[in-house]
């Protein structure tokens, strides 16, 4: 077995993140109920697929990709568990303020990860910046019990998710065609 070039796992992780983020934030802006579609995406595409992408980033020696994808994949799995376990009678419903603290911790983590993007593509920077803002607003909205803030956060989440999908498609198409099809603001 010789040196086999590994495929880029980032588009898989970015799509899992982006699509699941859009679906959850369609709920946050009030378009859809928090139902099985969002939960299933949270488990399988947002959760498991991102963790798989992170493990492939590990194989490539990419600490940032490993940390980002396995962490956010775990975020989706824990969020689904937080929302689903009370419905299964396994625990009480989450306290909104404590959910805000949970989201705030993810915001702090994301802020530090944002600093790790500053040598990367501009679109990646935007994904992490908008995700930091999203987590901050969701944390504040839950802690304060303010539905308007959560609703506004949903719009930020839609933009964040769409930017992650754009980045994923940029990486796929730019590699596939060997040229810039979708500009992602590559660092030089």
Regions found by a protein language model. Give the residues of each.
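Membrane-helix exit/interface motif
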Residues: 27, 52-56, 78-90, 109-116
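Alpha-helical membrane segments in multi-pass integral membrane proteins
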Residues: 101-112, 122-143, 149-170
């Amino acid at each position: 077995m010789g040196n086999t070039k590994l495929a880029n796992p980032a588009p898989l992780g970015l799509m899992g993140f982006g699509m699941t983020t859009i679906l959850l934030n369609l709920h946050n802006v009030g378009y859809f109920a928090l139902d099985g579609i969002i939960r299933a995406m949270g488990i399988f595409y947002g959760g498991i697929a991102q963790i798989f992408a992170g493990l492939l980033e590990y194989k490539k020696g990419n600490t940032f990709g490993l940390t980002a994808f396995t962490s956010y994949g775990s975020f989706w799995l824990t969020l689904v568990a937080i929302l689903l376990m009370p419905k299964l009678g396994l625990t009480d419903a989450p306290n909104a303020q404590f959910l805000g603290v949970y989201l705030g911790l993810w915001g702090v983590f994301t802020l530090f990860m944002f600093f790790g993007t500053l040598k990367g593509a501009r679109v990646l920077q935007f994904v992490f910046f908008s995700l930091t803002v999203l987590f901050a607003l969701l944390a504040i909205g839950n802690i304060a019990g303010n539905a308007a803030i959560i609703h506004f956060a949903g719009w930020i989440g839609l933009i964040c998710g769409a930017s992650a999908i754009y980045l994923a498609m940029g990486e796929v198409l730019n590699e596939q065609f060997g040229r810039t099809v979708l500009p992602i603001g590559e660092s030089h």
